C-alpha cells in the first residue's frame, strides 16, 4: 500500500478518509503521527490554504499528501467567516463561541437574507513539487437559523438549515450528511479523480 500523509491532526477526518482510500491502495496517516506541525495558513482562499497544507506535509514527509480546507460563507457578510470560520471569534475560539458570534452578527438580518454555503476543498499532491495537484471543491447551500438545533456534527452545523432535508446539519445522521455535504461532494470528486487517473 502507498502511504499518504493527511495534513491534519483531526482523528475523525483521518478515519473517514482512511477507510475510503484504502480501496485505492492508499494507507492514510495523520501528519501529527509523523511529527509534522500544521502549516501556516497564509492563503486568501480555501484552495490556496489546502495547497499550502498539502505541500507542507509532502515536503516534510517525502510522501504524497491530502489536505482539506473548509468553512462557511454567508452571502450577506460577503462570504465571511470564510477561511476564518474556525477562528471567527478569535484565534483559540471554540465552536460555540464562533456560532454565537455569527448569530449575534446576523441578529438584525431578515430570514430571507440568511443564505450561506459550506465549502470544502480537498487537494491531493503526488509529491511536494507536484505542478498539477488534484483540486476538488464541494459546496453545500443552506440558511443560517436564529437558534441552534441538533446535537450531531460540529462547528456551525446546529445553525445551518438544509432546506432539502427540512432540518439543520446537526440534526442529520452521519450517513445523511456525508451523502450531501460539501466534504462528501469534494471527497466523491477526489475518489473519482484517483479512480480515473
From Swiss-Prot:
Top EC category: hydrolase
Essential cofactor(s): Mg(2+)
Residues noted as binding substrate in the record, renumbered to the chain: 8-13, 70, 154-157, 177, 182-183
GO terms of molecular function: dITP diphosphatase activity; ITP diphosphatase activity; metal ion binding; nucleotide binding; ribonucleoside triphosphate phosphatase activity; XTP diphosphatase activity
Enzyme Commission (EC) number: 3.6.1.66
Active site: 69 (proton acceptor)
Swiss-Prot/TrEMBL keywords: Hydrolase, Magnesium, Metal-binding, Nucleotide metabolism, Nucleotide-binding
Cofactor info, note text: Binds 1 Mg(2+) ion per subunit.
Domain of life, source organism: Bacteria
Subunit and interaction comment: Homodimer.
Function: Pyrophosphatase that catalyzes the hydrolysis of nucleoside triphosphates to their monophosphate derivatives, with a high preference for the non-canonical purine nucleotides XTP (xanthosine triphosphate), dITP (deoxyinosine triphosphate) and ITP. Seems to function as a house-cleaning enzyme that removes non-canonical purine nucleotides from the nucleotide pool, thus preventing their incorporation into DNA/RNA and avoiding chromosomal lesions.
PANTHER family according to UniProt: INOSINE TRIPHOSPHATE PYROPHOSPHATASE, INOSINE TRIPHOSPHATE PYROPHOSPHATASE/HAM1 PROTEIN
Family stated for the protein in its record: Belongs to the HAM1 NTPase family.
Protein's name in the database: dITP/XTP pyrophosphatase
Taxonomic source organism: Salmonella typhi
Lineage, top ranks: Bacteria, Pseudomonadati, Pseudomonadota, Gammaproteobacteria, Enterobacterales
Amino acid at each position: 500500500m502507498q502511504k499518504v500523509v493527511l495534513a491534519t491532526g483531526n482523528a475523525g477526518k483521518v478515519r473517514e478518509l482512511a477507510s475510503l482510500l484504502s480501496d485505492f491502495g492508499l494507507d492514510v496517516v495523520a501528519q501529527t503521527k509523523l511529527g509534522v506541525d500544521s502549516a501556516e495558513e497564509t492563503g486568501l482562499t480555501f484552495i490556496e490554504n489546502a495547497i499550502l497544507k498539502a505541500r507542507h506535509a509532502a515536503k516534510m514527509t517525502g510522501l504524497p499528501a491530502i489536505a482539506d480546507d473548509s468553512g462557511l460563507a454567508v452571502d450577506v457578510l460577503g462570504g465571511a467567516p470564510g477561511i476564518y470560520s474556525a477562528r471567527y471569534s478569535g484565534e483559540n475560539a471554540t465552536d460555540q463561541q464562533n456560532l454565537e458570534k455569527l448569530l449575534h452578527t446576523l441578529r438584525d438580518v431578515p430570514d430571507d437574507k440568511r443564505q450561506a454555503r459550506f465549502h470544502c476543498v480537498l487537494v491531493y499532491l503526488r509529491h511536494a513539487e507536484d505542478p498539477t495537484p488534484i483540486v476538488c471543491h464541494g459546496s453545500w447551500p443552506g440558511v443560517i437559523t436564529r437558534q441552534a438545533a441538533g446535537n450531531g456534527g460540529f462547528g456551525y452545523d446546529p445553525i445551518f438549515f438544509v432546506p432539502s432535508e427540512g432540518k439543520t446539519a446537526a440534526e442529520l445522521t452521519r450517513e445523511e450528511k456525508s451523502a450531501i455535504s460539501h466534504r462528501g461532494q469534494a471527497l466523491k470528486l477526489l475518489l473519482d479523480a484517483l479512480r480515473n487517473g
